[in-house]
Amino acid sequence: WMVVWVERRRAIGLVELGPHKDGRDYEVSYQFLPSAWGHGLAREAVAVVLKNALSSAGLSKVIAETQSANTASCRLLRSLGMVEQKRVERYGAEQIIFSTR
């Protein structure tokens, strides 16, 4: 999904729901322009996608993977009720895999 900041009339990010690398789970991922950071817009958009995935799409859980060093992303995922499932080394850095359950 493309995320638009309505008040500013511009696209500011993307949220995606698709298969995770593990082949078992669906993953929510997101990217936002730095100008959109700190306004709660990513949280709002990811929350909508998670809600739809768990209700309308009928998924029993959704995961998200982010670098442990990305504290803002970790904080966002925790604020949505996601919990740390495990840590893995990937892409040359430690990643945390979060889950809705």
Language-model segment annotations:
Residues 1-101:
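Acyl-donor (CoA/ACP) binding surface of acyl/acetyltransferases
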